[in-house]
Amino acid sequence: MKMNAASIKNQKAEWEALGVKLPAFDHDAMTAKTKEHPVWVHFGAGNIFRGFIAALQQRLLNEGLQDRGIIAADTFDYDIIDKIYTPFDNLTMMVTLNPDGSTSREIIGSVAEGLRADSSDAAMMARFKEIFTDPGLQMISFTITEKGYALYRPDGSLMPVVQADIDEGPAHARHAMSMVAALLFERFQAGAAPLAVVSMDNCSHNGEKLQSSVMTVAKAWAEKGYVGQDFIAYLEDESKIAFPWSMIDKIT
C-alpha cells in the first residue's frame, strides 16, 4: 500500500489497522482550496518543517480551525520536492517515539503543494508569482538555517551569486534572499498587499537577519534603477511588510 492522496481516502481501514492516524479533514478539498487561494508559503521543506510546523498546521486543520494548508518550497535541495514530496502527494509519515518506548505513527497531510524555488524553471517561477500576487496570502516563513540568510563571504565581500543577482535585477534572482525580494516586488506591483515574513530558524534576532538580507538586495536594486523608492518604502512599512522575531527555544 502506497502513501498517497488516493490511499488515505479509499483505504482508511487498512491504514487504521496498521495503527496509522490519518488526517481528520477532507484532504482533497484542503488541497484544492489552498492552491486556489493560498495563505501560507514555507521555504525550507526539510524534516523540521515536516515534523513540527506542518504537524501543527495539521492539528488546526483536524480541529476545523483552518481550512487551508501550507505550500512548501525549497530553495536549495530540489530533490526534497522531486523525491520526497511529489511522489507521495506531499504527504509525510511522522513517527513519534513515546516516553514508554512505543511509537505512534501519523500521516501529515497539511502540505497542499511542493515547489522548487528554481529561478531557471519558468513554470515554477510563474507559479510563485501567481501565489505572491494573491492578496489573500498572509505569511511566508523560513527554516533554511542561519546560513540561508547570509549574503557575504568571510572577507566581507558579497557572495558571487548575490552580486550577480544585484547586477542582473529581480528578473534573474537565484539566491534565496534575492528571490524573496523579487517575489515581494511582484506583490508590490500587484497592489502592495500586506504580508508577514517570518523566520522560524533557531538564531538570535532571526527576523532582523531576514529583514537585513532582503533589504540589502532591494536597496541595491533601487540604486541600480531596477526598483523605485516606493518599493523600498513598502518593505519598510511595518503595516505592510512585517519581519517579526520568533523564539524557537530558550538557547538563543
Which stretches of residues belong to each language-model region?
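Conserved small-residue
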Residues: 1-245, 250
